[in-house]
Amino acid sequence: MAGFAGGGGRPTTAGVLPGDGSLVLGTDAPDQVAELFEVAEQLYLEAEQPVSPQGYTIAGAIIVPFDQAGPHPLRGYGLAARSLLAAREYQHQTDYLRQHYERELFPQYVGEAQVIDTPWGRRTTTVWGQGPAWELPYTDYVTFLVGDPPNVSDKFTVPFATVVDVVGILPVAGITPARYRANEWPAPETLATLKAHAIDLPSG
């Protein structure tokens, strides 16, 4: 693809490898990007051997994922593809880990990555509920469920990066895609700090 890099304001080649050996090519021109990602996403979802719905383009002399190619008016398509890819990869991992901990009789919650539509595009979120230890997928947001699972008294959503900074949770070694282990429910003062950073997301 590097041989098709644009220059002088010309559109740059964009390509996607959705799976089953298929390759979708186009450019990052505004009138082509939407269709490129829509076709690639459908092929990815239908593939027997899915690879990725993410587009790749040229940044300088390097082939990079579309969401990491720097400022672009249509970067949102790359972020949406990243969210879908993350959720699908975590889905397989979540199923495996839940079966593993159940088999080992280990009291461990395994958080699930979910895709949500926000006013600023498709993103990922997970839940951290009050109770035993959790392994949280690295999503865009975390929703805290306060109280026993049947009787949640409060819930609020915080950016994942803020949770890492405030609580200090760390990634679990040897797990890909990354998960962060939360051994204890946050103390009341920590929970209050987290809630102060809460944002509004669509419910559903």
Regions found by a protein language model. Give the residues of each.
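Surface-exposed, low-hydrophobicity interaction/linker segments
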Residues: 1-11
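Short beta-strand
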Residues: 13-17
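Short cationic amphipathic helices and targeting signals
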Residues: 20-26
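C-terminal structured domains
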Residues: 26-204
